[in-house]
Amino acid sequence: MDSTRPSRPKVSIADRFGSPPNRDNRRMPSPPKVLFGFHAVGVRLKTSPKSVFEVFFDASRRDARMRQFTDRAREAGVRLIESDGLRLAKMCGSHGHQGVVARVDEQAQVKSLDELLEQLEAAGTAQPLLLVLDGVTDPHNLGACLRVADGAGAQAVIAPKDHAADINATVAKVASGAAETVPYFMVTNLARTLNELKERNIRCIGTSDDAVKTIYDADLTGPVALVLGAEGEGMRQLTRKTCDELVSIPMRGAVESLNVSVASGVCLYEALRQRR
C-alpha cells in the first residue's frame, strides 16, 4: 500500500476568538484504516474518493443495492475486489459489514480544534455548535452521538483522551457515515479546553438531572458547546463546575435519564430549532 499522503493546504487565519495555549495536545485521533457497511464506505466514496484504496465486496450478493454501490465505486475509480462474507468479517472484525469493506487512507482534513474554529470564523459562522462528551466510553454510543451531531449540523464532537471511546470500525459503522463528516477531537484536559472555548466567547452549557432550568428555557443561540456526560454517571465534577450553566431534560416517566445519544439529540435539535 502506498504510504504517501496527499499534501493539504495549511490554514493561516487571524484568530478573532483569541489564541489559547497548548495547541499541540488537541489532535484528532486517526480515523480507521478499515471502514465497513454501505453508509460508512458510501460517505467516504462521496466526500473523498481518492482516499479509498480498495473496496472488497461479497460477490454472492447480486441485489440492486450492491450493484448500485459497486457502480458508484467504479465511477469513482476505486479498485473493486471480490470476496465473501467470512473473509470480510475477518477483515473488519464484525459480521455487520453488509458485504462491503474498504481500506482507506488515514486522513484528517481538520487537524486540530483550533484550526476548525479558525475556519468557522473565516467562513463567517456566527453560531458554531459543538457537542462535548464527558465519559462516553461505549463505541456504539459514540457512533450514535456522531450521527445525531451530523444530523443537527454540529461542527465537531469533543471528548477527553483518558475517558472516552476512540474512533474505530464499530464507531464508523454505527455512525453511518457521520464519522467521516463530523470532526472528533480527543483533548488532554477537558476542563481546560472548556475554559479555552469560553475565552473564545463560546458558552458551555452542561446537562444535569438536578438543574432547575430546562434545555427548553436556555438560550442556545450564538456560539454554544453542549456538554453531556455518560448515562447514569453524568459529567465529572470538574467538568460540571467549568460549565457556564447547567440545564436539565424534562423527564415525565419512571426512568431517571436518557441514553447519551438520545439526550444529545434532544439538546442539539433544540439548539437547531432556536436557530431557525
PLM regions with names:
Residues 91-106, 178-179, 183, 187, ...:
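Short basic, glycine-rich beta-strand/loop surfaces that mediate nucleic-acid
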Residues 205-259:
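Active-site/ligand-binding-proximal alpha/beta "capping" segment
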Residues 26-27, 43, 136-139, 143-149, ...:
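Hydrophobic, well-ordered secondary-structure scaffolds
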